[in-house]
């Protein structure tokens, strides 16, 4: 069995690749980059270029590894990637793939939009087995701009989430769940897991934890949705539509959409997910002022 890992250098795919490599599990990484040279067997994969899809399976044959039988399916959430995602699943089936692990999101139900449509498509195929992973917001988002710059330069976190709470999850834990699912496949045809952290935290609480870990006061600045969208657009430089979408998602959190509990990480992997305090201790150098 060879596993195709899409998402190349993404947060979860890169971590999954490391776990598979350490375990000696045959896998091939599909990446949109044509120049990146990584430590694993890689092949070019472009959602908008169908020639690269069939080349993935040819590459496995040329490399002398077992045929691809399972795919870690990571796609963008843009509407224009839904149809290519469906077509790729069908191409993969024609190449003998019968197992898929789809990375979706906690707030995307089957059949709704983006990855939810791919979820529904997989569910309609009686000859395949699939697992859908539905993680909540990544802890690692705070290690990227604009959050990391706000924390380092201003000692602030800006959001429109108000007092809304999120069960923040580490990408390491998402990768552990994906690894366990792919390497210890159960007999069920269809399954979905909510991949959530061990605690519900507001950004006020996140700021308090960072204050303790970093030894300086970090403040959560609660903004109205329109004000956050304006900040992301004018100060951060995000496209207006994207800034508005992110601000809207945060308002959803304010209204309680991410208040969820799940023990799926422990059920699948046998161990609890990382707490935000432990994550902050591990990553605190990233927020330190130099």
From Swiss-Prot:
<comment type="similarity">
    <text>Belongs to the fgaFS/easG family.</text>
</comment>
<comment type="function">
    <text>Festuclavine dehydrogenase; part of the gene cluster that mediates the biosynthesis of fumiclavanine C, a fungal ergot alkaloid. DmaW catalyzes the first step of ergot alkaloid biosynthesis by condensing dimethylallyl diphosphate (DMAP) and tryptophan to form 4-dimethylallyl-L-tryptophan. The second step is catalyzed by the methyltransferase easF that methylates 4-dimethylallyl-L-tryptophan in the presence of S-adenosyl-L-methionine, resulting in the formation of 4-dimethylallyl-L-abrine.</text>
</comment>
<keyword id="KW-0520">NAD</keyword>
<dbReference type="InterPro" id="IPR019901">
    <property type="entry name" value="Ergot_alkaloid_biosynthesis"/>
</dbReference>
<dbReference type="InterPro" id="IPR051604">
    <property type="entry name" value="Ergot_Alk_Oxidoreductase"/>
</dbReference>
<dbReference type="GO" id="GO:0009821">
    <property type="term" value="P:alkaloid biosynthetic process"/>
</dbReference>
<dbReference type="InterPro" id="IPR036291">
    <property type="entry name" value="NAD(P)-bd_dom_sf"/>
</dbReference>
<dbReference type="GO" id="GO:1900809">
    <property type="term" value="P:fumigaclavine C biosynthetic process"/>
</dbReference>
<keyword id="KW-0017">Alkaloid metabolism</keyword>
<dbReference type="GO" id="GO:0035837">
    <property type="term" value="P:ergot alkaloid biosynthetic process"/>
</dbReference>
<protein>
    <recommendedName>
        <fullName>Festuclavine dehydrogenase easG</fullName>
        <ecNumber>1.5.1.44</ecNumber>
    </recommendedName>
</protein>
<comment type="pathway">
    <text>Alkaloid biosynthesis; ergot alkaloid biosynthesis.</text>
</comment>
<dbReference type="InterPro" id="IPR007110">
    <property type="entry name" value="Ig-like_dom"/>
</dbReference>
<dbReference type="GO" id="GO:0016646">
    <property type="term" value="F:oxidoreductase activity, acting on the CH-NH group of donors, NAD or NADP as acceptor"/>
</dbReference>
<keyword id="KW-0560">Oxidoreductase</keyword>
């Amino acid at each position: 069995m060879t596993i195709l890992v899409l998402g190349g250098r993404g947060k979860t795919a890169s971590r999954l690749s490391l776990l598979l490599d350490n375990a000696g599990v045959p896998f091939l990484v599909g990446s949109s980059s044509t120049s990146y040279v990584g430590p694993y067997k890689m092949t070019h994969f472009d959602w908008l270029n169908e020639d690269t899809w069939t080349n993935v399976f040819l590459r496995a044959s040329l490399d002398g590894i077992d045929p691809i039988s399972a795919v870690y399916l990571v796609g963008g959430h843009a509407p224009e990637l839904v149809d290519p995602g469906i077509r790729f699943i069908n191409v993969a089936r024609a190449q003998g793939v019968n197992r898929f692990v789809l990375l979706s999101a906690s707030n995307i139900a089957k059949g709704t939009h983006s990855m939810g449509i791919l979820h529904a498509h997989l569910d309609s195929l009686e000859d395949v087995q699939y697992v859908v992973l539905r993680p909540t917001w990544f802890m690692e988002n705070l290690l990227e701009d604009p959050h990391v710059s706000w924390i380092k330069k201003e000692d602030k976190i800006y959001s429109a989430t108000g007092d809304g709470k999120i069960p923040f999850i580490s990408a390491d834990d998402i990768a552990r769940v994906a690894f366990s699912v792919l390497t210890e496949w159960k007999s069920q045809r269809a399954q979905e897991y909510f991949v959530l952290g061990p605690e519900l935290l507001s950004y006020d609480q996140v700021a308090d934890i960072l204050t303790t870990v970093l030894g300086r006061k970090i403040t959560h600045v609660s903004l109205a949705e329109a004000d956050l969208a304006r900040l992301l657009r004018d100060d951060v430089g995000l496209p207006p539509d994207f800034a508005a979408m992110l601000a809207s998602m945060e308002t959803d959190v304010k209204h309680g959409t991410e208040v969820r509990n799940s023990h799926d990480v422990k059920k699948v992997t046998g161990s609890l997910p990382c707490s935000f305090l432990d994550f902050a201790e591990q990553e605190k150098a990233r927020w330190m002022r130099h």
